[in-house]
Amino acid sequence: MSKEKFERTKPHVNVGTIGHVDHGKTTLTAAITTVLAKHYGGAARAFDQIDNAPEEKARGITINTSHVEYDTPTRHYAHVDCPGHADYVKNMITGAAQMDGAILVVAATDGPMPQTREHILLGRQIGVAYIIVFLNKCDMVDDEELLELVEMEVRELFSQYDFPGDDTPIVRGSALQALNGVAEWEEKILELANHLDTYIPEPQRAIDQPFLLPIEDVFSISGRGTVVTGRVERGIIRTGEEVEIVGIKATTKTTVTGVEMFRKLLDEGRAGENVGALLRGTKREEIERGQVLAKPGSITPHTDFESEVYVLSKEEGGRHTPFFKGYRPQFYFRTTDVTGTIELPEGVEMVMPGDNIKMTVSLIHPIAMDQGLRFAIREGGRTVGAGVVAKIIK
């Protein structure tokens, strides 16, 4: 058993606990690490080690998060747990800790609460497609019918937000009893781990996705043509392949005639690498920072979208005053700022620093985007908000 945990060949999956405050997210996180360490090897983490989560800064936003790791026989998991509700919202919107799937903790003694609903909705908006439910504190509920009612309520809530309510795995357990080593409740943690392994599909690695490179700089090299540089966000680009230049202007096609890294010519550039791509027959002035090079047909330019946004508080260096409809900040996508206007939800007149809000944005230039793309909201180069594209309108 001891050999297994050093094998890094297992698929790596990112998960996290979500749910209403005091429903037992952190206790469950501790229980998972403890029970899985006991059965499959790895390190257990005590409740208080997880609970005093260190502060992190993601894009200037202060978020408290705890990261733990654990193994099942087939996978390695990185798991994020946040102590406060605001931390969750910030985390989900900024994508500070990516989640391929989530464990929604619902106390059987309370049933779904307002934050339960908000976390499910956020999951839907930002594209956490796989959520497993852990019905916690079941040791404190004697009435089987009550458990069934709570379970039904949770399933209905999921269906309401376009999740597969009937097929969502729900585990009835007690994180505290499992943490205390009670065998029947430890079993429930193993059941949960089994759902993690089977319900959340293996995430597609960045390298297996269609090629995309956000353009950071454009150079003209005499006798050779135009070179664009940037970090490959996903996929692989090979010399001789056709690409599209997408965003800001009308989409055009060209061929990559060379890929270089550190002044050496390569056959290909891969996700995560900083490369220069030499483009055939493309003039320096036809391309600009903020556009992307992409596999033809894989991404399209858009101006109007719905988004979930977190507005930085004054303490985080954000605005000191609210903003109103008609607000025109810059929206920073990948490598560049684009001006846009906002529409607030019906009945919302103003947005205060520290709020999270759904807003519809119209940009003055189209940007290559798909659902889940993160952006910053800026005023004169200063970040005042963070957001994620929830739905493309046009």
Swiss-Prot record:
Residues 174-176 are annotated as: G5. It catalyses: GTP + H2O = GDP + phosphate + H(+). Its EC number is 3.6.5.3. GO terms for cellular component: cytosol. Residues 60-64 are annotated as: G2. Keywords: Cytoplasm, Elongation factor, GTP-binding, Hydrolase, Magnesium, Metal-binding, Nucleotide-binding, Protein biosynthesis. Its main location: cytoplasm. Mg(2+) binds at T26. Residues 10-204 form the tr-type G domain. Residues 19-26 are annotated as: G1. NCBIfam families: EF-Tu, PRK00049.1, PRK12735.1, PRK12736.1, small_GTP. GTP hydrolase that promotes the GTP-dependent binding of aminoacyl-tRNA to the A-site of ribosomes during protein biosynthesis. Monomer. This is Elongation factor Tu-B. It comes from Pasteurella multocida (strain Pm70).
